[in-house]
Swiss-Prot record:
EC number annotated for this UniProt entry: 2.7.1.-
Molecular function in Gene Ontology: NAD+ poly-ADP-ribosyltransferase activity; tRNA 2'-phosphotransferase activity
InterPro entries: Ptrans_KptA/Tpt1, RNA_2'-PTrans_C, RNA_2'-PTrans_KptA, RNA_2'-PTrans_N
Organism in which the protein naturally occurs: Flavobacterium johnsoniae (strain ATCC 17061 / DSM 2064 / JCM 8514 / BCRC 14874 / CCUG 350202 / NBRC 14942 / NCIMB 11054 / UW101) (Cytophaga johnsonae)
Gene name for this UniProt entry: kptA
Coiled-coil regions listed in the entry: none
Keywords from the named record: NAD, Transferase
A single GO BP: tRNA splicing, via endonucleolytic cleavage and ligation
Protein name: Probable RNA 2'-phosphotransferase
A Pfam family reported for this protein in Swiss-Prot or TrEMBL: PTS_2-RNA
Amino acid sequence: MNENIAKSISKFLSLVLRHSPEKIGLKLDENGWADVNELIEKCTKKGNRLDAELLDYVVENNDKKRFAYNEDKTKIRASQGHSISVELNLAETEPLEYLYHGTVGKFMESIQKEGLKKMSRQHVHLSKDKETAVKVGSRRGVPQILTVRSGAMYRDGFKFYLSENNVWLTDEVPPKYIEFKS
């Protein structure tokens, strides 16, 4: 399998399954699921050659496990990261005592004042380890790793969810729960 093609398809799937399904005329249900056959057909019509084999490859080999099938592989959705309103039906889960967030220097002043906000997404994304947070932060420049006192947040009433691909999600992280030196 050509990795460049797989990466291109993965990026396109992120666009249509997380942010803009209307770009190809795709309908997602309230839980973010799309019909696999409809997705393949509409992607192909828009010039993104996709078949079941390539889709399987992208879903199974994506390093971040961004996509998931339902049990019979007739539907697909993004695991998290939506900017459109979907209900992922994730159960509230007690987090680890500390979680991590990767960002870059230009956002630090705002984060110190306002904390971590979900911005255009449905949740703030947190990692269980610093290594993952470094990778996330590195996508935009020199990473700054924030340690989040998630256990304290949970005890104070904040809700946490664990996505299908092991990304921790919460609605916000106020500055008092963030350690800025790690």
